[in-house]
Design a protein with these regions (language model features):
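Conserved SAM-binding loop of SAM-dependent methyltransferases across substrates and taxa
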Residues: 20-32
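Conserved beta-strand signature within the Rossmann-like core of class I S-adenosyl-L-methionine
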Residues: 103-111, 307-314
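Flexible, glycine-/basic-rich loop-and-beta segments that form/coincide
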Residues: 158-203
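A short glycine-rich, Lys/Arg-flanked "PGG" loop and its adjoining helix->strand segment in the class I
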Residues: 90-105, 300
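Short, glycine-/aromatic-enriched active-site segment of Class I SAM-dependent methyltransferases
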Residues: 106-131, 135-138, 142
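Conserved SAM-binding strand-loop segment of SAM-dependent methyltransferases
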Residues: 51-66, 269-270
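Conserved class I S-adenosyl-L-methionine
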Residues: 9-19, 224-228
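A conserved beta-strand element that flanks and buttresses the S-adenosyl-L-methionine
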Residues: 75-78
């Protein structure tokens, strides 16, 4: 956020789905006027306690117009990790257009469909997501609400995301070459053709078979396998593969609220992380695989007894 303030020098920043105000807190620290729009009342209250002005609303064209009338147009509107959660994309985008100044900027971060498919990240497909965006489809969605996509950045977050930069359609702003370059990559990868999705399904099936074959083989050999992490993506993977305690004895998680509970659908017990060192399993299946570098270092102690880490995606890897 500091980079945005330095580069665009906004006088007023609005964040949609601003949560507890963490991001806008940096804007407040810079002395820039800001406003959060957050539908959750209790979370919005936390933001206000930390000094971030916040209204409790779901964004719509009407809410966007009202906020603009009361607070003025925003030089920058930020919407991170929310665009895929919206059933009414056109209405939400029209709300963004209502908020932003006629010469302003809209910044949206969302998971990139290209990376999801290239790296077989099927476990990041959640029921709470209504859409999965390529740059090509995002450009169309934005245009439907009166915004023109003018630039795109590739980000490593969530296994691969995109930051979309859009401006009011009528401004006629120049479009970065990066937009066309990424769309060309998407087309080459088959994202604009139904056959590409069939190939993705075939790769996902192989990832599933390989993981199950490993777990069954380990069980047959009497080797112990436990999990690390109980993230949302892990629940998708466990349920898709049909992995239950006969193949994965338990998993651990740092969140104390999950201890003593079970993974939904598959009923794998969840314990504190210390359980791994106590039991010294042969293998640890890492469910938040997107944190591979960090967790390989964090779980290096598993090697002390000859244990190994297992990463299921993009393909089975035992290290």
């Amino acid at each position: 956020m500091n980079d945005v303030v330095d580069r665009l020098r906004p006088g007023f920043v609005v964040e949609v789905a601003s949560n507890d105000g963490y991001l806008l807190g940096h804007v407040v620290d810079r002395g820039v006027r800001c406003l959060g729009i957050e539908p959750s009342a209790n979370v919005g209250a936390v933001a206000r306690e930390r000094g971030v002005p916040t209204v409790t609303e779901f964004l719509s064209p009407e809410v966007g117009a009202r906020v603009r009338a009361e607070h003025g147009p925003a030089d920058v509107v930020v919407a991170n990790n929310v665009y895929a959660h919206i059933p009414d994309v056109v209405g939400f985008t029209q709300g963004l257009r209502a908020l932003v100044a006629d010469d302003g900027w809209v910044s949206i971060e969302v998971q990139h469909l290209l990376t999801l498919m290239e790296l077989n990240q099927y476990d990041t497909i959640y029921h709470e997501h209504f859409q999965y965006y390529s740059v090509a489809s995002a450009r169309q969605a934005l245009a439907g609400g009166g915004l023109a996509l003018v630039d795109v950045e590739l980000l490593p977050t969530h296994g691969g995301s995109i930051r979309l930069w859009a401006r009011p359609m009528e401004l006629g702003a120049a479009v970065s070459d990066r937009v066309g370059e990424v769309i060309a990559r998407e087309q080459a990868a088959g994202l604009l053709d139904i056959s590409g999705y069939g190939q993705f399904a075939d790769r996902v099936a192989k990832v599933r078979r390989d993981l199950l074959a490993f777990l069954v083989r380990a069980a047959d050999e009497g080797r112990s396998v436990v999990g690390y992490g109980a993230p949302g993506k892990g629940n998708t993977l466990l349920n898709h593969c049909g992995i239950r305690p006969d193949l994965l004895a338990y998993t651990v998680d740092r969140n104390p609220y999950k201890h003593g509970r079970f993974t939904p659908g598959t009923r794998v017990p969840i314990f504190p992380p210390e359980r791994i060192a106590a039991d010294r399993p042969d293998y640890v299946l890492v469910l938040p695989w997107n944190l591979k570098a960090e967790l390989t270092d964090q779980l290096s102690y598993v090697r002390d007894w000859g244990g190994k880490l297992v990463f299921p995606i993009p393909s089975l890897e035992i290290v």
